[in-house]
Amino acid sequence: RRYDLDILRILLTVLVVLGHASYYTINTKFGGIHYDQILSDMMIQDAGVHKATSLLTEWIYSFHMPAYFCLSGAVFSLELKKNRYSSVSKLIREKAKRLLIPLLFVWFVWNIPIKMLAGYYDGLAHPLMMAVIQIIFPNAVYLWFLEALFFCFIMDYVIEKHIKNVGQQFIIVGTLALIGLGFYKYARQIVPFGNPFRWLIWFWTGHFIDDILNELSKTSENHGFKSKKRAFVAESFLFALLYEISFCTASVKWILINTVMPFVGIIWIWTFARIIESALKEEHHKKLLAISQNTYGVYLWAEPLNYLVLSCVMKWFGISVFGTEMGAALIYIVRVVGTVVISVLITNMLRKIRCPIKAY
């Protein structure tokens, strides 16, 4: 078993939870929340804690979703080598069962009801209808990932089966990435199914990530970096430098965050996962696997609870608590710890009752 992939899955899930725990504002055509605007209207200054966690989220978002797609592509590459999918129809059936059915289940029994309670759809003439339509246009809804991932599996399968030349494959996924980035920049609110064109290139990169890392490891050794840890430090400096450069201008930032930054971030966090794996003893593998098996459930069930936490704090304590350092810190901690605990409980309950819908 590839324990480095389990570790990577855990690390990325942690980053997702941390990233989701900082937002005060979500704007979509289908609803949203506007706590930043309320703070501004009440002339309450944002807390330093929230500013810091927002910066952390911005850094996380510079690479963690491309890394997620790359991880999925790496696992898919291993499956293809074992001839797991004999046809595209079999692939569609299996991935629909694993991705789309859980998506719809969670969307209707969890995402919509919780957001209704939290006021996400307030002000809409037809909130339920808009909530259903939003499935097709899931911009700023965390479940967009499953939609985009489903189509990435299909597109990648077709490319891998019918085009053997890697250069030609790169031209195709690169062209689709440019189209997807155009959609993202100019029409993100109306791009359907999570904009899979934008993410396919990172999924496809998963086929080659081991070779890339192994080659970089050899190059690092030739330049005096005799251990993964030293290479990791060098990668960290490069990552930090690129992130600093990205603040030069908005255009430079946009280009870097959609091209170089994700690639460097993928290399960085993958190396980190390998360092952790090399430090683990064999008796830790069972615990590692148990944690890894909960990551999908955390992804599915945790995020909507953020809306409920914010809504409850607003109703019980008022907007002023958002502007205090202690209040902002406690809100963030509850959003991180509370959402994970509840989602793990739900995941284990569904696993225990053997729920036929694999939303865990």
Language-model regions, residue ranges each:
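Alpha-helical transmembrane segments and their immediate juxtamembrane cytosolic regions
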Residues: 1-360
